[in-house]
Regions:
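Receiver (REC) domain active-site loop signature in two-component systems and cognate sites
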Residues: 59
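Hydrophobic/aromatic residues positioned on beta-strands within the core alpha/beta folds
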Residues: 81-83
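Short amphipathic alpha-helix used as the core "switch/output" element in two-component signaling
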Residues: 65-76
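Alpha4 helix (beta4-alpha4-beta5 surface) of REC/receiver domains from two-component response regulators
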Residues: 66, 85-114, 123-126
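Two-component/phosphorelay signaling modules centered on CheY-like receiver
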Residues: 14-33
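Helix N-cap/capping motif at the beta->alpha junctions
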Residues: 34-43, 64
Length: 208
């Protein structure tokens, strides 16, 4: 049996399948958590990044195809296993970013072989997200300033009202996946990125 600390996050919208996978993998010594769709996964991952992600490809809200693309970019250390009842390993559409594939309906031994093939080395990921930089978009119908933010986790965009005009780095939450986003505002009228920092004399000026 594996080390009890090895964690697997199961992503499956069918509750009966999700529960069965959790029970089987827990029985064989894995520490499991689960989520019903891609957006829910991003919230679960913020609590603890798993060693292994076992994800269905066809799900509501955010498909497995989209989810695996995000995981590949944001959490490259996670070993990703795609699963589906619609495809075989030789029929997976190109562009699916997964380390392995499990066909639904195959035996438990097949699944365990795939899980146990995960490399043991794992690169640690930073706890604090890097800030993104955005420009002011103008004013909303009530006259308030806002910016448009593209979430670095789920890649969806949403408007964000500007309430704090003094801080260099601001915090917000994604309107879709609720992930923490740190962002700074670049004034389009500024002659250069350095001008952003000139308004904050106590902030260090970056090397350009």
């Amino acid at each position: 049996m594996p080390d009890i600390k090895t964690s697997i996050l199961i992503v499956e919208d069918e509750e009966s399948v999700r529960t069965s996978l959790e029970e089987v993998l827990t029985f064989f010594g894995y520490r499991t958590r689960s989520a019903a769709d891609g957006l829910a996964v991003l919230k679960v991952i913020r609590e603890e990044v798993p060693e292994i992600l076992l994800s269905d490809l066809n799900m509501p809200a955010m498909s497995g195809f989209e989810l695996l693309s995000i995981i590949h970019r944001r959490f490259p250390a996670i070993y990703v296993i795609a699963m589906s009842g619609m495809f075989t390993e030789n029929q997976i559409p190109s562009g699916v970013t997964a380390d392995a594939f499990y066909k639904k309906g195959d035996g438990v031994r097949d699944l365990l072989k795939i899980v146990e093939a995960r490399p043991l080395e794992r690169r640690e990921l930073p706890d604090t997200p890097e800030p993104i930089w955005v420009q002011r978009n103008g004013h909303d119908v009530s006259g308030g300033e806002f910016v448009t933010i593209a979430c670095p986790e789920c890649f969806r965009t949403f408007p964000q009202a500007i309430n704090d005009t003094t801080s260099l780095i601001l915090d917000t939450r994604c309107a879709f996946c609720d992930s923490r986003i740190r962002y700074g505002i670049v004034d389009p009228a500024a002659s250069s990125f350095r001008d952003v920092f000139s308004r904050h004399p106590l902030s260090p000026t970056p090397a350009l």
